[in-house]
UniProtKB/Swiss-Prot annotation:
Disulfide bonds: none annotated. This is RNA-binding motif protein, Y chromosome, family 1 member A1. Residues 204-214, 242-253, 276-289, 313-326, 335-349, 484-496 have a biased composition (Basic and acidic residues). The lineage of its organism: Eukaryota, Metazoa, Chordata, Craniata, Vertebrata. InterPro entries: Nucleotide-bd_a/b_plait_sf (IPR012677), RBD_domain_sf (IPR035979), RBM (IPR050441), RBM1CTR (IPR012604), RRM_dom (IPR000504). SUPFAM superfamilies: RNA-binding domain, RBD.
Length: 496
């Protein structure tokens, strides 16, 4: 190729736009034979005002440069110089001349590409002295696109126009924005999606475990209440019945907030409704935690046991206190799938054991002591009758009796329990002093005067009658001692 370090190549700048290759060859051919004339054109094939002429003899090129430089051609003074290879193509990197910065690189690149490639790499020997157009930069930029960032970088560092200066600052701003967004996004991650997942997984694990920690609090530890829309009518019924004598938090916790697992309870809402009408008329504020919604560890297995629980509730829970029903087939079983064969014995036992317990006794037993007797309840009720879980709970509250038998000794235990919880009951503004007349209960007043019911203790068969018969046979509901005011209520089958 001729352009590879060819000393006979001249650069002619400042040409008239009307000058073409033939005119250039005719003018410069006087100094010697010309091998190539290259007129740089734009996309529209119009002259850009400069050209390259290659002489066969380098001496002729030198003579032509000396002779033609500064002369007028077609009405314009031209510049003729020795063309040089760009410094970046010969291994080094040089900044383009000052006048070259005002030229558009894209046009020169495309026009050079459209022309012959033989003279593409040549530049004039004297850089920075082109008066009318600065063609050298166009050639430089046409030879290599890679120099465009290099050309732009120094101009921004040396105080170029504001738009060029703003580019690095924009990048810096974007980097700073990204940096600032990083911690914010991390903080969002800490408070957003994962906690929810963690919450879901944690409450699911809670639901299937044997721990009843969540039951001890009143602040809604049960995050899954969104599936309870099918159970709103039963809970509405509870609120109607139970809020008559309950404190402020009873209604808010009922059926909406305090469910451990409510998505499987739609089959059990009617049994719990029956319980609510009979049992919780005088219950206290947290009583509704046990209403068929919250107090089931796993209610998907209690399908067969809800009706026995209903009948049992009319007999046994009719006059129990506020957390008494937590142990009745719903709440006190960490896994109710074990209660399949033991529901009637458990019914009898819960009836006898919780008959005279008060608010704190039930809350401790219903919440924290489920681990002890809940599983024993599912495994063996004879062992449960003589187990120590109830004994520990009762002794902790001032009772000195052991596990309750089915008959006589239970009465003294109940009496002492009534006496032990008089202060706790007074905190809530009312006491629960009398109990069911189903046969095995006795009722105590605040002075812990306990007397046994006149009837003989019924057998297991009599303790567990038909649900409607049981509902009608309970006569004593409660004798509430509240600042000297007492009221009693008769339970009949019309509440069923």
């Amino acid at each position: 190729m001729v352009e590879a370090d060819h000393p006979g190549k001249l650069f002619i700048g400042g040409l008239n736009r009307e000058t073409n290759e033939k005119m250039l060859k005719a003018v410069f051919g006087k100094h010697g034979p010309i091998s190539e004339v290259l007129l740089i054109k734009d996309r529209t094939s119009k002259s850009r005002g400069f050209a390259f002429i290659t002489f066969e003899n380098p001496a002729d090129a030198k003579n032509a440069a000396k002779d033609m430089n500064g002369k007028s051609l077609h009405g314009k003074a031209i510049k003729v110089e020795q063309a040089k290879k760009p410094s970046f193509q010969s291994g080094g990197r040089r900044r383009p001349p000052a006048s070259s910065r005002n030229r558009s690189p894209s046009g020169s690149l495309r026009s050079a590409r459209g022309s012959r490639g033989g003279t593409r790499g040549w530049l004039p020997s004297h850089e920075g002295h082109l008066d009318d157009g600065g063609y050298t930069p166009d050639l430089k930029m046409s030879y290599s696109r890679g120099l465009i960032p290099v050309k732009r970088g120094p101009s921004s560092r040396s105080g170029g126009p504001p738009p060029k200066k703003s580019a690095p600052s924009a990048v810096a701003r974007s980097n700073s924005w990204m940096g600032s967004q990083g911690p914010m996004s991390q903080r969002r991650e800490n408070y957003g999606v994962p906690p929810r997942r963690a919450t879901i997984s944690s409450w699911r694990n809670d639901r299937m475990s044997t721990r009843h920690d969540g039951y001890a609090t009143n602040d809604g530890n049960h995050p899954s209440c969104q599936e309870t829309r099918d159970y709103a009518p039963p809970s509405r019924g509870y609120a109607y019945r139970d809020n008559g004598h309950s404190n402020r938090d009873e209604h808010s916790s009922r059926g909406y907030r305090n469910h451990r697992s409510s998505r499987e309870t739609r089959d059990y809402a009617p049994p719990s409704r029956g319980h609510a009408y009979r049992d919780y008329g005088h219950s206290r504020r947290d009583e509704s935690y046990s209403r068929g919604y919250r107090n089931r560890r796993s209610s998907r297995e209690t399908r067969e046991y809800a009706p026995p629980s209903r009948g049992h509730g009319y007999r046994d829970y009719g006059h129990s206190r506020r957390h008494e029903s937590y142990s009745r087939g719903y709440r006190n079983h960490p896994s109710s799938r074990e209660t399949r064969d033991y529901a009637p014995p458990h019914r009898d036992y819960a009836y006898r054991d919780y008959g005279h317990s008060s608010w704190d006794e039930h809350s401790s037993r219903g919440y924290s002591y489920h681990d002890g007797y809940g599983e024993a309840l599912g495994r063996d009720h004879s062992e449960h009758l003589s187990g120590s879980s109830y004994r520990d709970a009762l002794q902790r509250y001032g009772t000195s009796h052991g596990a309750p038998p089915a008959r006589g000794p239970r009465m003294s235990y109940g009496g002492s329990t009534c006496h032990a919880y008089s202060n706790t009951r007074d905190r809530y503004g009312r006491s629960w002093e009398s109990y069911s007349s189903c046969g095995d209960f006795h009722y105590c007043d605040r002075e812990h005067v306990c007397r046994k019911d006149q009837r003989n203790p019924p057998s297991l068969g009599r303790v567990l009658p038909d649900p409607r018969e049981a509902c009608g046979s309970s006569s004593y509901v409660a004798s509430i001692v509240d600042g000297g005011e007492s009221r009693s209520e008769k339970g009949d089958s019309s509440r069923y």
